[in-house]
Regions:
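Alpha-helical scaffold/interaction cores of sigma-54-like transcription cofactors
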Residues: 1-562
Length: 562
């Protein structure tokens, strides 16, 4: 969406979903799901598309694929445009089976679900005889029903010459080789055609091209960015009754009270003027920027962790420059003592969401996340997805394998690729620069060149998705009102059972651009080790050391270390 806006292109937001008849009537061991193209015509349609995508994962996930049924489509059909689909659609599969009567019935069901005027019949030109056969029936049924055709391209790669790279990618996905592929496309026509190529391909049905413009004009979706969707914090009752009710204390007032208590606890009573002045300044900035609730939310789950005996880190990053965070015991680093700047953490001249990274013991991290989920509602809390891309080393090994070479062949080439620098792997462009070891090998050996040519076509492609190691999003409303969710494999628990988590379908940056509150719950094994060490000391001496009061200039300690 943002890329289109930046380049002056009107975005058309859509999703190819897997559609089934009825989740409730699904026969055991049998799963028939088909492709269906859905486009958002307006903001309501976009919200419904988000809901459908989420429900497909959260309610219809089976055998590694999400799916929605016709009842769900009808429930969320407002504002959607449905295209009859590619060869893998139910509509085309009926035609392939020589059952045009069933295809027509399915078309009627689609029109009932999203509205007659919102269904278009797809014709495609991909060089497959079965597609040409389907096109004849698609045209006939569309005209019988009085609905327009629309010319589409089933795009799987950008340029025609990318066909071979796509074939290699399919082999990577299916763990097969190019000589014996498990899945193959029979033509090289599944690329993104130019407008002239589309016009030439559908010259037989010029109305199919006109419909593409009609649909583009109908689709008008604006995604609101830059909001602050921070949940309200349930403050205690003030003059009236009930948290967050009519008599609830204002968030700013409650935060100020907690900071005042923290100032006395940290600096003594009376509070030193320097500390009071710094706290007043920070509270003013926090209030003006609308982040009172943010600090209360962080204070609350950190307090829960400490009250529950879960080890919490002393603070990391720019948040250590905040006296408010120090007084709330979010951090244990005195910014006055160490002359740390608040503006590095929260700058009134640059409006952006604050970012406090919290460290918890690995053993306790899940309990903290569970607490936050229960407090703000499981519909409003999720972990954030992350996408793993194919970088040169992995792409080289995969390319060698799909070409049928032994593992050692690809591994030898991969080892010629330099190590990542500050976490960033080098690109093939950098690896093939003059003087680089990989370039020399490619120039010397034809097999190496063939492998690297295939690997370059795989570079940058998303290989898999996983759960971000730390990031959790907390919303002021159900997340499916804002963005789609899915489930992700979180590995096995202590009993060996597979664990699945609800995660966002959007990665970190889009989540933040939508204005959602993102928190980092980092699990540090160091904290577990320290806790175990303190337990050993307590058992041996009867006293448990307080880490926050240990002297930093203890001579015997330094003598032991050096």
């Amino acid at each position: 969406f943002m890329a289109c806006q930046k380049r002056g292109i009107k975005p058309i937001i859509g999703c190819e979903v897997y559609i089934v008849d009825d989740h409730a009537r699904r026969a055991p061991g049998r799963l028939e799901r088909f492709h269906l193209t859905l486009l958002a015509a307006d903001p309501t349609g976009y919200r419904n598309l988000v809901k459908l995508s989420s429900r497909g994962f959260l309610e219809g996930y089976q055998r590694g694929k999400p799916s929605v049924d016709m009842a769900q489509l009808a429930e969320h059909g407002q504002g959607l445009i449905a295209l009859s689909g590619c060869l893998q659609s139910r509509f085309c599969q009926h035609l392939i089976d020589d059952r045009p009567d069933l295809a027509r019935t399915h078309a009627s069901e689609l029109m009932a679900a999203v509205g007659t005027d919102n269904v278009y019949f797809e014709v495609q030109k991909n060089g497959l005889p079965v597609q040409d056969k389907c096109n004849e029936e698609i045209v006939r049924i569309a005209r019988e029903l009085g609905r327009p055709l629309v010319g589409t391209g089933d795009v799987h790669y950008l340029r025609r010459e990318d066909y071979h790279h796509h074939a290699a990618l399919l082999c990577v996905q299916t763990k097969s080789t190019l000589s014996q592929p498990k899945i193959t496309f029979d033509t090289n026509e599944f690329y993104l055609r130019s407008s002239q190529e589309m016009a030439d391909a559908f010259a037989e049905w010029p109305e199919a091209i006109a419909s593409t413009l009609e649909i583009a004009e109908r689709c008008d979706v604006e995604i609101e960015l830059g909001r602050q969707l921070i949940p309200r914090y349930p403050t205690p009752a003030g003059a009236g009754e009930g948290a967050m009710g009519e008599g609830a204390m204002e968030e700013g007032e409650y935060l100020r009270r907690l900071v005042d208590e923290g100032l006395r606890r940290r600096y003594g009573d009376p509070i030193p003027a320097e500390a009071m002045e710094r706290a007043e300044y920070e509270l003013g900035v926090i209030d003006r920027m609308g982040f009172n609730a943010y600090f209360l939310i962080v204070w609350d789950f950190v307090k829960f962790a400490k009250d529950s005996g879960i080890a919490v880190g002393p603070g990391r990053g720019s948040a250590a420059g905040s006296i408010v965070a120090y007084c709330l015991q979010i951090t244990d680093v005195d910014p006055l003592r160490y002359d740390l700047l608040f503006e590095r953490f929260l700058n009134p001249e640059r409006v952006s969401m604050p970012d406090i990274d919290m460290d918890f013991s690995v053993r306790g991290r899940e309990r903290v996340i569970r607490y936050v989920t229960e407090k703000y509602g499981k519909e409003a809390v999720a972990q954030i997805i992350t996408f793993g891309k194919m970088f040169p080393r992995a792409a080289t090994r995969d390319a060698a394998r799909v070409l049928g070479h032994e593992y050692g062949v690809g591994d030898r080439l991969a080892k010629l690729i330099p190590d990542p620098i500050m976490g960033r792997p080098p690109s093939f462009e950098e690896c093939l620069a003059p003087g680089q070891p990989l370039r020399a090998e490619v120039d010397r050996d034809g097999t190496a060149k063939q492998i690297v040519d295939v690997a370059q076509g795989l570079e940058g492609i998303v290989r898999n998705s996983s759960i971000h190691a730390a990031a959790v999003v907390i919303s002021d409303r159900p997340l499916t009102d804002i963005m789609p969710l899915q489930i992700a494999d979180a590995g096995a628990d202590e009993n060996g059972e597979r664990v699945f988590r609800t995660v966002t379908q959007f990665s970190m940056k889009p989540v933040e651009q939508l204005g959602l509150l993102k928190m980092d719950f980092l699990g540090l094994r160091n904290l577990d080790v320290i806790e175990d060490a303190l337990d050993i000391v307590a058992r041996a001496t009867g006293e448990r050391p307080n880490m926050s009061t240990l002297p930093l200039d203890h001579p015997p300690t330094y003598e032991m270390l050096a």
